[in-house]
Amino acid sequence: DRCLSRGLGDVYKRQFNEVCKKGPVADEPVMGMMVRLVDAKLHEDAIHRGPAQTIPAVRNGIKGAMMRAKTVLLEPMQKAFVSVPNDWLGQVTREVTNRRGIIEDMPSEGDVTTVVGVLPIAETFGFSNDIRAASQGRAVWNTENLGFEMLPPQLFDKVVGEIRTRKGLKPEPNPESYYAC
């Protein structure tokens, strides 16, 4: 309360919002996070508790806490509907499952089956050409966005490294200790 009553509450809120725009893991927006300020020591002399001192301390404290927490990445997902003659059903289901897809349903009408699967959007690049090749051009497909799901933990380090490299950052994020004051 003492920190907030000295006008620093706005500094904390602003830094929280800034960190949430570009998190320390992948330099991507952060959501679903709460920070609770438990304690803060301020220098007695007002000249030593200005923005130049408090902003980096608050920002680094939030980033350090994030690195200590069990951070997850969310990836966009989509549902694919692929209608294909039964002769090419195996090839189409293989294309879906090879892209971390999960087949939810396969209703049939005559000699055409519709494969209904959920796939990460990141795995769908080239999907159109591969489905066309797998079905000799006989498949018809479309997709709908499903929102976001948690990236499987075993892919976390690989995907974070790819994102960071694409952004010109070193592949591994700074550890919690980097942000210690």
Predicted regions mapped to residue ranges:
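Single conserved hydrophobic/aromatic residue that forms the stacking wall/gate
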Residues: 1-12
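Conserved helix-loop functional segments at active or binding sites
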Residues: 14-25, 39, 60-72, 98, ...
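Short, contiguous acidic/charged loop-to-helix segments that flank catalytic cores in large enzymes
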Residues: 6, 45-49, 116-118
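Glycine- and Gly-Pro-enriched alpha-helical subdomains that act as flexible
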Residues: 39-77, 81, 86, 90
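Flexible, glycine/charged-enriched surface loops at secondary-structure junctions
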Residues: 22-32, 68-78, 106, 141-142
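Charged, surface-exposed alpha-helical interface/stalk elements
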Residues: 75-181
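Beta-strand-rich non-transmembrane domains
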Residues: 30, 34-41
